[in-house]
């Protein structure tokens, strides 16, 4: 004997069982832990709600530098990257580019290079349209699609924003 009406009932029972099994209390957002590196500035959590900051075009600049296990600092235009000691296991030829566009963005290569310890990226937005919103650094595609909003420290009085990065790619200033 076939029970044609039992499939919808089974689906309802399974849905209720899965719904009850998946609850684990408060699932709301939590504040990120305090980071002493950023001090008393505003820290922006990693939630992609950003738009790229509109700026007067930067001129294209390319800087090449070899950085090794001792670390080093690379300055490209008004932006800088500080790689700490121990972040790289061997000497690496790094290319930093300040990309000419209506957003402030930088691109680092070799693309995909990862660090054993995060590097600190500092970006200026002195040439950008001023907004009251907090600024952050975002990881983008080459077409400037935002992939990830990084936890950042905005210092509006000096018009710089700082974040740590764990790999090379393209980054831009957002709000």
Enumerate the language-model features and the residues they cover.
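Sec-dependent bacterial lipoprotein signal peptides
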Residues: 1-21
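Bacterial Sec-dependent N-terminal signal peptides
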Residues: 16-55, 175
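Secreted/processed peptides and extracellular or luminal domains of membrane proteins
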Residues: 28-29, 59-62, 89
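Proteolytic processing hotspots in large secreted/extracellular or virion-associated proteins
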Residues: 40, 45-50, 54-57, 67-70, ...
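Intrinsic-disorder/low-complexity, polar/charged segments enriched in Ser/Thr/Lys/Arg/Asp/Glu/Gln
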Residues: 60-62, 78, 118-120, 160-162
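Predominantly extracellular/luminal regions of secreted and cell-surface proteins
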Residues: 63-94
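Short beta-strand segments within Ig-like beta-sandwich modules, predominantly Fibronectin type-III
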Residues: 150-155
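C-terminal beta-strand-rich structural cap/linker in extracellular carbohydrate-active enzymes
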Residues: 160-175
């Amino acid at each position: 004997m076939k029970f044609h009406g039992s499939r919808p009932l089974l689906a309802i029972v399974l849905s209720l069982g899965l719904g009850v099994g998946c609850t684990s209390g408060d699932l709301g957002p939590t504040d990120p832990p305090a980071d002493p590196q950023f001090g008393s500035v505003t820290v922006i959590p990693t939630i992609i709600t950003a738009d790229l900051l509109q700026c007067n075009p930067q001129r294209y600049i390319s800087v090449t530098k070899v950085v090794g296990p001792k670390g080093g600092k690379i300055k490209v235009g008004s932006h800088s990257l500080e790689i700490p000691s121990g972040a790289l296991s061997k000497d690496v030829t790094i290319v930093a580019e300040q990309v000419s566009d209506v957003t402030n963005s930088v691109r680092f290569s070799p693309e995909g290079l990862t660090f054993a310890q995060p590097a600190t990226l500092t970006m200026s937005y002195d040439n950008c349209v001023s907004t009251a919103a907090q600024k952050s650094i975002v990881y983008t595609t080459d077409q400037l699609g935002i992939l990830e909003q990084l936890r950042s420290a905005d210092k509006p009085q000096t018009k710089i924003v700082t974040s740590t990065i764990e790999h090379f790619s393209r980054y831009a200033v957002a709000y």
